[in-house]
């Protein structure tokens, strides 16, 4: 059965769950901005911004009665009723959001006949899952953020929302500093990652994890080194030919890698050759890291995170092009998640699929997991999928190809100086004239508030505190 967007938002959208999500930290619902997006008969988008509601029922009425509604968004928490006039009401808080879009990875084939292909996007989901996994690790290890909600976008990406109190209270400058830190103050070089990203990886001892993600997901599962051209492209990212001291090694490396039977063998060959020259040229392993990071590390939209007044599409919105619902994804199901099967779709509506997707929102998922455990049924058995969870013993195993970085106290002390520099750059950038529509927060002492004491985010919406590997070690 096909469902129209109007029917979905009138009868099927979970407004009560959304309101509970956005007010769980004690924020007043009337002070949260909502914006509704419609589509005219001519195909032009139009919006209603600064919408304020008192209840979930009122929000449902506003969205349902909006002409030709396509989706709706939530924005910042204001000092009073949301307004475009900062003298009336100014934005002071917002969920810290990150946007991961597969189109930012130039090596992923997403188009077919000139248009974005949904099956190709589905096939590339592991890339998105790896980006989410690394992002949440950095957010916890660097900033202590653990109250995260991951939402599948409906086509080619994911949104990560942080509900920690400290994250929600950040100014636009603070948000810019965080996105700059995660991005490593990235440049425009798409062939390899910047030294900033490499430093972030080393500071948090993520090299082994990054290598494991690349080998298991990208090389073995996705086959990114299966073809001759793909291997030559990867070697080009290393750019080793211009170093005369490595000429003997590169002369052997290229033909050997090209002739390997599988992508996994090609990857092993590359690692072995570079390990062989690390005594005389230790920097080559850093260059390999940067090439790998270009595939694995998340590439994030700065504007989505930086602007405290930015609008964010609500969880469980329907995607205008695919008809899929932007459903939440549990941290321990990132790799097992299959968008084509598990995301509810307006094109062929199945209420059971929607009910399953809502389990993460309304608290039934945890109860069901406990009941299954008592019955001796594993989640992998229920889903009929591979279980990617690891036990404590597996996590302690060493991968001989990817030795873990030792703790480096000299690297760790660089964190404060990097953050200070990123904040300085962010403040300079935000003072530019073309950012005049970016509204900073009012001083906290001048902001009247009746917010209730902070409530902890329900466990069902958060990542597990323990950061377990996303893929198994071999």
Describe the predicted segments one by one.
Residues 82-88, 136-140, 144-152:
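Catalytic micro-motifs at enzyme active sites that drive phosphoryl/nucleotidyl and oxygen chemistry
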Residues 87-120, 185, 190, 194-200, ...:
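Residues forming anionic-ligand binding surfaces in small-molecule and nucleic-acid pockets
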Residues 405-474:
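Long, low-complexity intrinsically disordered regions
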């Amino acid at each position: 059965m096909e469902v129209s967007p109007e029917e979905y938002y009138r009868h099927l959208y979970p407004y009560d769950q959304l309101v509970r999500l956005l007010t769980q930290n004690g924020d007043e619902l009337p002070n949260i901005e909502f914006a509704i997006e419609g589509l005219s008969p001519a195909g032009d988008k139009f919006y209603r911004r600064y919408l304020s509601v008192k209840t979930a029922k009122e929000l449902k009425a506003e969205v349902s009665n909006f002409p030709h509604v396509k989706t709706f968004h939530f924005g910042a928490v204001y000092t009073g009723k949301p307004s475009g006039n900062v003298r009336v009401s100014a934005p002071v808080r917002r969920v810290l959001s990150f946007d991961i879009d597969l189109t930012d990875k130039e090596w992923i084939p997403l188009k077919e006949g000139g248009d974005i292909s949904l099956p190709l996007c589905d096939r590339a989901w592991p890339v998105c899952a790896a980006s989410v996994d690394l992002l949440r690790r950095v957010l916890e290890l660097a900033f202590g953020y653990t109250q995260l909600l991951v939402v599948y976008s409906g086509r080619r990406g994911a949104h990560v929302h942080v509900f920690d109190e400290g994250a929600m209270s950040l100014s636009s400058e603070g948000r810019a500093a965080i996105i700059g830190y995660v991005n490593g103050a990235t440049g425009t070089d798409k062939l390899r990652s910047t030294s900033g990203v490499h430093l972030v990886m080393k500071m948090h001892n993520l090299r082994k994890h990054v290598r494991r993600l690349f080998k298991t997901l990208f090389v073995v599962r996705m086959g990114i080194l299966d073809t001759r051209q793909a291997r030559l492209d990867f070697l080009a990212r290393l750019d080793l030919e211009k170093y005369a001291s490595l000429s003997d090694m590169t002369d052997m490396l290229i033909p050997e890698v090209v002739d390997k039977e599988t992508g996994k063998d090609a990857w092993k060959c590359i690692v072995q050759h570079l390990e062989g020259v690390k005594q005389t040229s230790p920097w080559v392993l850093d260059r390999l890291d940067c090439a790998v990071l270009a595939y694995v590390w998340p590439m994030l939209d700065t504007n989505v995170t930086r602007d405290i007044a930015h609008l964010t599409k609500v969880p469980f919105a329907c995607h205008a092009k695919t008809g899929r619902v932007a459903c939440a994804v549990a941290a321990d199901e990132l790799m097992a998640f299959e968008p084509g099967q598990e995301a509810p779709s307006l094109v062929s509506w199945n209420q059971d699929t929607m009910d399953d997707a809502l389990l993460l929102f309304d608290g039934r998922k945890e109860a069901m997991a406990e009941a299954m455990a008592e019955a001796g049924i594993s989640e992998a058995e229920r889903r009929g999928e591979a279980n990617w969870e690891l036990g404590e013993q597996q996590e302690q195993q060493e991968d001989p190809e990817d030795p873990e970085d030792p703790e480096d106290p000299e690297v760790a002390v660089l964190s404060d100086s990097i953050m200070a520099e990123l904040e300085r750059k962010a403040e300079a950038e935000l003072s530019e004239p073309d950012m005049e529509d970016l509204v900073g927060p009012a001083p906290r002492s001048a902001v009247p508030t009746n917010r209730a004491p902070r409530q902890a985010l329900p466990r069902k919406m958060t990542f597990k505190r323990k950061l377990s590997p996303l893929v198994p070690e071999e």
